[in-house]
Amino acid sequence: MSGPNPNKEPVDLNRTSLFWGLLLIFVLAVLFSSYFFN
């Protein structure tokens, strides 16, 4: 009975997708700022 809780997986997946979304926005912001300041 020590298996992963099925109700926990969608939350982890949502948190991971949110983390990658924020990381992608951060990288795009850095690229755009370096492009505009050059």
UniProtKB/Swiss-Prot annotation:
UniProtKB keywords: Chloroplast, Membrane, Photosynthesis, Photosystem II, Plastid, Reaction center, Thylakoid, Transmembrane, Transmembrane helix
Domain of life of the source: Eukaryota
One of the record's GO cellular component terms: chloroplast thylakoid membrane
SUPFAM superfamilies recorded: Photosystem II reaction center protein L, PsbL
Subcellular location: Plastid, Chloroplast thylakoid membrane
Transmembrane segments: 17-37
Membrane topology: Single-pass membrane protein
InterPro entries noted in UniProt: PSII_PsbL (IPR003372), PSII_PsbL_sf (IPR037266)
Biological processes per GO annotation: photosynthesis
Keyword Chloroplast in annotation: yes
HAMAP family: PSII_PsbL
Function per UniProt: One of the components of the core complex of photosystem II (PSII). PSII is a light-driven water:plastoquinone oxidoreductase that uses light energy to abstract electrons from H(2)O, generating O(2) and a proton gradient subsequently used for ATP formation. It consists of a core antenna complex that captures photons, and an electron transfer chain that converts photonic excitation into a charge separation. This subunit is found at the monomer-monomer interface and is required for correct PSII assembly and/or dimerization.
Record's subunit section: PSII is composed of 1 copy each of membrane proteins PsbA, PsbB, PsbC, PsbD, PsbE, PsbF, PsbH, PsbI, PsbJ, PsbK, PsbL, PsbM, PsbT, PsbX, PsbY, PsbZ, Psb30/Ycf12, at least 3 peripheral proteins of the oxygen-evolving complex and a large number of cofactors. It forms dimeric complexes.
Similarity field: Belongs to the PsbL family.
Protein name per UniProt: Photosystem II reaction center protein L
UniProt source species: Porphyra purpurea (Red seaweed)
Higher taxonomy: Eukaryota, Rhodophyta, Bangiophyceae, Bangiales, Bangiaceae
